[in-house]
Amino acid sequence: MLILDGSRTEAEDTACLDLARRLTEGGHQVQHERLRDRKLGYCQGCFGCWVEHPGRCKTDDGHAEIGRAFMAADVAVLYGPVTFGGYSAALEKVLDRFLGLIMPFFQKYGDITRHTARHARHPRLVVVGVTDDPHGTDARTFRKLAMRNAVNLHAPRVDLRFIDRAPTESARADLARCVIEPEAVAA
């Protein structure tokens, strides 16, 4: 399992650290990437990952190993604060640079158009938005964004959870169960 932790501060990632601990104690192999500790660049929008060197970003800053870990994972958790209806800057940088994980071609998927897959298998996504208002405008926008990202990343399944900035023990346990056995926890 891969956890991409987009928390901006230590205070924000206590529930994420708790999730990693619970999964590890449950016997799961977990790679927890605290993105704020990495010096990752922004996507330059050059499309080199599509046309010059397919699947690889020209910027060599450690992002490639995150992409490999993402594709190797059975489950990838995207964790971070809901920021104006989007991801934190650290998590957005990583997701933007996942462009090389898909092809520059399009296909119809239901009633939408998406990029074709570059790889045969993709991880299940668990998207965790940290917010104290899971029913507000920002959360509704975040939900749409996360679901569209899941479609473009060809996730075979996506589970979206909102968690308070100071979650209860029960909420933390439910989050871990959602990652391990998603059918057991109602949305």
Which stretches of residues belong to each language-model region?
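Short loop/turn motifs enriched for small/polar and acidic residues
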Residues: 36, 130, 163
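Glycine-rich phosphate/pyrophosphate-binding loop and the adjoining helix
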Residues: 134-187
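Short, intrinsically disordered/low-complexity patches at protein termini
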Residues: 90, 101-102, 110-112, 161
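Short, glycine-/small-residue-rich phosphate/pyrophosphate-handling segment
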Residues: 103-152, 156
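N-terminal beta1-alpha1-beta2 submodule of the flavodoxin-like/Rossmannoid cofactor-binding fold
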Residues: 1-80, 84-103, 169-187
